[in-house]
Structures are given as C-alpha cells and as structure tokens.
Amino acid sequence: MALRRIYGTETEYGIVHRGVKDSNPISASSFLINAYLSTTSDQGVGPNAPRVGWDFIDETPEIDIRGFAPIGSLPPEIEANLVNAVLTNGSRYYVDHAHPELSTPECLDPLSLLRWDRAGDEIIVKSMKAANEVLPPGEEIIVYKNNSDGKGNSYGCHENYLISREIPFGRIVQHATTHFVTRQIFTGAGKVGSEAVGEKRMETPFQLTQRADFFEEEVGLETTLKRPIINTRDEPHADPLKYR
C-alpha cells in the first residue's frame, strides 16, 4: 500500500514599488498584504482581525540532517512587527524578509496542491489591484513570480519532504540531486543573461533556470550563502525518531 503524503509549497514573490524615490521592499510587501486583507469580508482575516500567534519553541532549524548542530543554535525569532495572516482557505500570507510569501494549506494529493498554488497566484493579483487602487497617483506596486531580480538577488519556491530515518542519507542525495538538476530541462523558468559572480551578464544569452547561478554546494545547511541543491535542515514536524 502506498504511503499517503502531505503536500505543500511556499512561494516567495519578487516585488517592486514604482514611482517612489527610495523603494523599500519590506514596506511594499506589508502594504500589499494589508491592502488585500482590507478588501476581504472573510471572517477572521479583515483589517481588525486578531493576529495569529506562532509558537516556535519546538523548532530547531539549525539541526543538520547529517547529525550535528552549530553551537548556540536556537529556535527562530519571529519578526512580530511584520504582516502575518492566515487566510480562510488555510494558506499563510506573510512578509518574509523582503518578499511577500504565500504558503499553501496542507494538501493530500498533487492536484489539490496545484489548485491551491494557483489560488495563491490569484490572491497576489487581487492584492496588487487592491494596493494600486489606494496608492498615490504615479505610484504602482508590481509583483513577479520569478526566482531572481537581475541584480544578484535570488529567492524561490521551497519544497519540503518528510522521509523515513531508515533511508540512508547518501542514497537520498544520490537520487534526489539528479532529479532536481535534470528536471530544469522541463520546468525551468528561464532567464536572459547571467548573475553568477565573475561573469558578465550578457555573455550568457539564455539559461533554462533562473536560480542555477546562485548554487554553490550540492549539500548544506545554509539558505542564503553557499546555497545547496539539497538543504540538510532536520526539522520533521513529526516523530523525530521515525522521520526527518
């Protein structure tokens, strides 16, 4: 019998605030999300809805799947001053550093996940419309579903997998890396030019994937420096004796 799996995605979107002298992506992201929340009549998500509390006490994102943790690693600190909303469809809509991010609800099959992912895109479109209706003349917020901004900054769509601890980690790396790299032939978003360190932008006419320029390691724990193809964060959100 096949194991039933839970699916979900987290998508970071690119954002730009046009028509202002000093564009701040954090402020723009907060404005975008609040504009959407102010237009919805759904109970519990409007402008006067109570904030959702997040308990990170049991989370240890610095524990490495290879069996160690950096000295002094602590549960993450939530940036309580940033917008953080749970929508009525179960999605989480929030500001993550300098991006609007939308996480789907937990789904029980790939088709449901695809539907909720597309619903997230529609929420972004409605958010842009709501934000631009109240901005001063000459200003505009635009959101992009991309993976790099053309200036050396990268962000993306995260995939998280719950796997049995009985499976040797080396076996996972062997097979998963091959899949993650070769699937770009079919699913890569593509981009013109290069953002890799030491390369001239237009010496690379076209790439199949927007994010390849930013990967430096095959395996690792970092998410913003020395980005790996496979991240080794050991945070199962399940029985840690059985899963990772």
What would you call each of these model-derived segments?
Residues N147-S164:
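Histidine-centered divalent-metal-coordination microenvironment in nucleic-acid enzymes
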Residues D149-G150, A212-F214:
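Acidic, glycine-rich active-site loops and adjacent beta-strand->loop/helix elements
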Residues P168-G170:
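A short alpha->loop->secondary-structure connector
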Residues S164, G193-E195:
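Hydrophobic, small-residue-rich alpha-helical packing segments that form membrane-like cores
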Residues M1-Y144, Q174-K191, K200-M202, D213, ...:
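Terminal catalytic/cofactor-binding subdomain
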